[in-house]
Amino acid sequence: MKAYQDASLAPSRRAKALLEEMTLAEKVGQLNQRLYGFRIYERKCVNGEDSIELSEEFRQEVEKYSGLGVLYGLYRADPWADKDYETGLTGVLSKKAYNQVQRYVLEHSRLGIPVMMSSECPHGHQALDGYLLPVNLLAGATFDPAMVRAAYRVSGRQLQNMGVDFALMSMLDVLRDPRWGRSEECYSEDPYLSARMAEAAVIGMQESGPEVVAKHFAAQGEGTGGVNASAARIGERELREIHFPPAAAAIKAGAKGIMAAYNEIDGVYCHANRWLLNDVIRKEMGFDGIVMSDGVAIDQLDSMTGDNVVSGALALQSGVDVGLWDEAFGKLEEAVRRGLVKEAQIDQAVLRVLTLKFERGLFEHPYLEEEGEIHVDYAQNPESVQLAREGLVILKNKNQVLPFWENQASGKKIAVVGPNADDLYNQLGDYTPPLRRDDGITVLDGMKLIFKESDIRFSQGCYLRKRDENLLKEAVDTVKNSDIVICVLGGSSSRFGGASFDTNGAALLDNAAADDKGTLMDCGEGMDCSDLELPDAQLELLKELKETGKTVIAVVICGRPLVLTQVCEIADGVILGFYPGPRGGQAIAEVISGRVAPSGRLPVSLPRSTGQVPVYYNYKNSYRAMTYMDEEAGPLFPFGYGLGYGTFEWGTCSLSTERCNVAALENKGLTISFSVKNTSERGGYIVPQIYVTDVAASTVRRVKELKAFQKVWLDAGQERTVSLQLGKEAFCLWNQKMKYVAEPGVFRIELSDSAQTIWKGEFTLCI
């Protein structure tokens, strides 16, 4: 027995022993993830039994490198992958396909090295029968990391059951410009909230088995003009204050992978930035996993290097360990021959890959048990719908029109109107597989489910981006004969409307043209926009419905912070739901009915107009205010805002100390304690948030920064004391020498909920 075959040895030692046995070609093969897994097979039916046939391209790739490092997207299903329930992998066939692929690799690998599988999981597994969650932006609105952790624990069990080694999860992007099409993949505009959610998602997923590849590093949410993959024109301090905290949190939580971002920062692509991929995440943050490329990103370095071989060498030297769909990493042998990279540098990356394979037990247990179902029942695993419930945000509730109690609605006629009222894919978000209709609940479905004693009437009213006179007239007639109106508006990241795609899967703007029904993917990867208003057709519909004199509740389902100024002027009640997932319609109906107490808080600020962007709350505290001569100051709705149905009485708030030195702060922290009482007749949530403002410092500070929060449930009439803790980091800054320090001085402390200040105090940090 050779050392690498000895399971009693440490994974790192086995990896080193195996590396010594490998040829250069075999090493290069371990760093490649060139294949699109969904294209390596064809599904066939032989004698009534489903099976797959592996492609010649796959066979040649395995032969070329005597093995395979990582295979992307074997289970991926969506219009870009061209896989659905007829052509893709589902049920037992998924596990059989995994075993067939793994068996072929092992049998054609000279050293018997198994392949690792990576799979998209931005909000649940992008696979047939994948357990789907609301998008990250809604998860951020829950202000409930424990719920996010629980949801990803369920998702992780499914991925583990399917043999997925790497869950590719969006969590590092901080949303600074809502024009960006991938806004939905961000948790927040705030680094602290984003970091807490990233930490929870990593822990939840990895508790169930798969390793997390956290993406994207870094500053992809800061693209110029909100354009995808465009330059982030910021400096090191902005990177450290805003964009690094989620990565640091994910790494601290145990993430084994980091995916580099497409964009460049100050003229250097992230995939060619050794300071980012080595100095920051490895030396400063202590990361010891693999750095993965984003799709075709290494080849895109050709625009800078002019030579694909040089691009591969540059990415490797900069810290990328594993490629994705690129040609450049397949040419690393040539790079060695040309003296562009040393074999020792390749060895370092290969060691990381092999160590993970040993840690995951793939050498001893390379195959899956083929029995058992992969489908996860949403009713028995309610974490997805619970996320949706907690993440819906009430923006307006004129005269307490909400909730519309079920007994109050009994026998009433309820009109459910709008282009997003009964379109399942429009509430799911991007990176979504085909979904079995029985697994989804639209708003129309949800209203029928909850308001069983009411007469539910549906009318579409218009298309997403196109007016239709007949649909509009039908909707107005329906509303005239109804008692209350639920008008469901918004956008769509659905890839199921005839869009075409780039080589990396991003939707192409030129070809994603609206069909005769005006269906258009207006959000998601590649769908950046210059106007954040709802389309004219939808605003006209809302106005026409309100002119009937009926009470109108607007529900907006979308993937980015929109300008909802007109919507809030017209409607009596407004509910915002960032793509709430497959059971989102149920959650919305439950909130409307009062079965669920709304508790979502905005994880982003909503602008009054597109020209007001950027409108994030934590801007720099310079002597000039962030105002315009032709627009009201401040956002339409600020970060942290969200209404509920209950009333709460806040009592005395106090600090554990009003003055201490850095050593004492580091040892004991600062505790903010307050009492609160639910004075309403039903239970409900509060979401207390602590903001800190540095009054005087050596660098320009922000007007305020979120440093702590907690989601707290109070039964009717219940009173309790809540305590929130601030550590030393809450008072630290990056000084002029770019050192992370706590400077002595005065800090303002603010306690708020739903953007309402409850208490303000001061704390002094001494030398």
Stretches with model-predicted labels:
Residues 1-735, 741-757, 762, 766-767:
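Glycoside hydrolase catalytic-domain context in secreted enzymes
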